[in-house]
């Protein structure tokens, strides 16, 4: 009996410990784990499970990402020490302790179940997103809140933080609150910088070529982490070429602070220094005062990224084509070919890229997006998984994986991948917009609107969150708000010129206008809706949504009890064109459905149904039903209609 009783008493403690598991999603550089009760640090491994009491530390040029059991994501910066602590209120409350370093916290599920500690303060998380920094007991603890609410407590009191606020806890435990800087600036250390150096441009001495051989070989192969690990320790006698290579590897691995320190030691007017400054400016969307024509392959590749940040896609593609034959250069060409929707050229370029640099993660990610465009979901998922195996912090690969899983109907997995994408690169407005779409589709408008707001705050010129939020409002019959957001999306359309060529921008505007036409019609502005749909067709005649809108509009103008059915031929023509242009399974085959151009966040269902019935006091009945869907790329629709008219029927005057 005593054994049984002691066993029952232990169960809550065991359940609490097991409830707070986490796994290492990805890491780069030297990252080590210390198990609870052990004194021996061991190297980290991807997907390694950590338990309460375990510790994780990152080296000088290292990062790691943990996903907790409640789907919280911790993005841990270099030189950090983190411990997962036993719950303070088993089994609900979970805790982690940041002894030193910096982390980014993101949770969109149940953030109220987590607490954190630093040497100076504790925090109760009632928010979902913040940046936390600690410097032991001798330095300050700093917290900047992007979204939600956090209660920060010390022996001197408690401070409640709202979104956009930050707090500093000094060694004497006093708390000072202030307004935070812009959200995008708070997460600058999470930015991803492209690799641009062509090692053939380096003027290395023979002895330097030998000492850097392993690192250079890994870099040419596209393996930035291996190149970082193979770098010899810096010495005072390092030549400018050695410093340039070290700078390139550090920047591509994400350690921009160390890279900028090295950049300051290079000659300001050197070709390499200009190239690296252009890359940093491109990622931060900053302007560069002077742009002399590059004289190296590295310079042209850096110029390509900078010109894209200035919305000069043609110039960017021309610069990439002058950047040589490296895997990095061919990957860049493939990315820009995709921006012009030139899929054949993109396929040739990405094949060359992978042949030249088989371990370069962005190359596999680009090929994944190509396969996704071709609806080869198995191949796309394999490419994205390969990219993530090489670099688990690549946000584009997580996004591609999410979109692919969504197309396969694996909605929950897709949303988890989107959360990881947002955690890897929290400054990317596009990732937040996609995550908000997922919440909207799953019927969670509060979380959706929260991420839409954050996406707008990260990039006020991005039309994507306005478009998606407008469609979200339309799904919940909030059409006035939908009109407002869709109008703003149309107004901001050309701000996407950083990523889209002119032809694709026109297609984007057509999509926005077609959806805006539906919203106008829903609020009773029929004539405005017609004109907006006409503009959509003028921008892009291949926009199936605009043709579908025209078909529905003509159908409403028909009079089934009159002799004049002149709209029927035009309606059938528009419906035929819409179905020829539309992707399969969008429900457009049916003549009974209302306008079906709402974005389907994660793909159409295999089977869906719609129906209505109408009865009039004169004895007339009108009913219709439709079954439609998509199975393995095949779209279908089955319509039925039954009508009885008590003495009235079409063309009854003959």
What are the functions of these language-model segments?
Residues 220, 252, 309, 339, ...:
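Register position in tetratricopeptide repeats
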Residues 237, 269, 322-326, 356, ...:
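Structural marker of alpha-solenoid helical repeat scaffolds
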């Amino acid at each position: 009996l005593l054994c049984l009783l002691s066993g029952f008493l232990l169960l809550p403690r065991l359940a609490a410990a097991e409830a707070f598991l986490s796994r290492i999603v990805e890491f780069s550089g030297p990252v080590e784990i210390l198990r609870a009760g052990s004194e021996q640090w061991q190297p980290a491994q991807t997907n390694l499970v950590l338990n309460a009491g375990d510790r994780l530390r990152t080296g000088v040029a290292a990062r790691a990402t943990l996903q907790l059991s409640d789907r919280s994501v911790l993005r841990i910066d270099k030189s950090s020490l983190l411990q997962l602590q036993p719950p303070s209120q088993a089994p609900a409350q979970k805790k982690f302790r940041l002894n030193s370093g910096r982390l980014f916290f993101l949770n969109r599920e149940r953030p109220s179940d987590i607490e954190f500690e630093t040497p100076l303060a504790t925090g109760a998380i009632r928010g979902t997103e913040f940046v936390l920094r600690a410097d032991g007991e001798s330095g300050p603890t700093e917290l900047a809140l992007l979204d939600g609410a956090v209660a920060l407590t010390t022996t001197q009191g408690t401070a409640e933080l709202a979104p956009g606020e930050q707090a500093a806890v000094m060694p004497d435990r006093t708390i000072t609150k202030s307004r935070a800087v812009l959200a995008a600036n708070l997460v600058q250390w999470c930015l991803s910088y492209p690799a641009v150096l062509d090692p053939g441009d380096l003027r290395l001495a023979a002895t330097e070529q030998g000492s850097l051989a392993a690192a250079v070989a890994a870099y040419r192969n596209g393996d930035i982490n291996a190149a970082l690990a193979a770098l010899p320790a810096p010495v005072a006698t390092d030549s400018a070429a050695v410093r340039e290579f070290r700078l390139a590897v550090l920047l591509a691995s994400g350690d921009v602070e160390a890279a900028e320190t090295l950049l300051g030691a290079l000659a300001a007017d050197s070709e390499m220094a200009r190239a690296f400054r252009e890359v940093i400016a491109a990622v931060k969307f900053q302007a560069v005062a002077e742009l002399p024509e590059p004289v190296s392959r590295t310079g042209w590749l850096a110029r390509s990224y900078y010109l894209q940040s200035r919305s000069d896609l043609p110039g960017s593609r021309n610069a990439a084509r002058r950047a040589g034959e490296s895997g990095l250069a061919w990957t860049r060409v493939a990315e820009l070919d995709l921006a012009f929707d030139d899929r054949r050229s993109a396929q040739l370029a990405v094949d060359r890229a992978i042949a030249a640099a088989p371990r370069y993660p962005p190359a596999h990610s680009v090929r994944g997006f190509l396969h996704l465009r071709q609806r080869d979901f198995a191949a796309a998922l394999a490419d994205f998984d390969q990219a993530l195996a090489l670099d688990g912090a690549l946000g584009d690969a997580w996004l591609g994986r999410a979109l692919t899983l969504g197309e396969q109907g694996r909605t929950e997995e897709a949303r988890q991948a989107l959360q990881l994408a947002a955690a890897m690169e929290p400054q990317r407005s596009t990732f937040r917009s996609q995550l908000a779409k997922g919440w909207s589709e799953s019927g969670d408008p509060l979380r959706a609107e929260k991420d839409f707001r954050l996406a707008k705050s990260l990039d006020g010129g991005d039309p994507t969150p306005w478009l998606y939020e407008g469609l979200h409002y339309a799904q919940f019959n909030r059409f006035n708000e939908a009109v407002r957001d869709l109008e703003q999306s149309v107004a901001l359309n050309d701000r996407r010129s950083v990523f889209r060529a002119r032809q694709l921008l026109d297609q984007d505007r057509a999509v926005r206008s077609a959806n805006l036409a539906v919203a106008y019609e829903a609020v009773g502005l029929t004539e405005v809706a017609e004109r907006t749909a006409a503009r959509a067709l003028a921008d892009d005649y291949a926009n199936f949504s605009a043709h579908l809108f025209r078909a529905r509009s003509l159908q409403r103008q028909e009079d089934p009890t009159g002799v004049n059915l002149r709209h029927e031929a035009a309606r059938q023509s528009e419906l035929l064109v819409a179905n020829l242009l539309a992707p399969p399974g969008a429900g457009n085959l049916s003549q009974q459905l209302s306008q079906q151009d709402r974005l389907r966040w994660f793909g159409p269902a295999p089977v869906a149904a719609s129906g209505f019935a109408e009865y009039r006091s004169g004895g007339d009945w009108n009913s219709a039903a439709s079954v439609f869907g998509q199975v393995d790329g095949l779209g279908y629709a089955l319509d039925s209609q039954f009508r009885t008219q008590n003495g009235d029927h079409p063309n009854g005057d003959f």
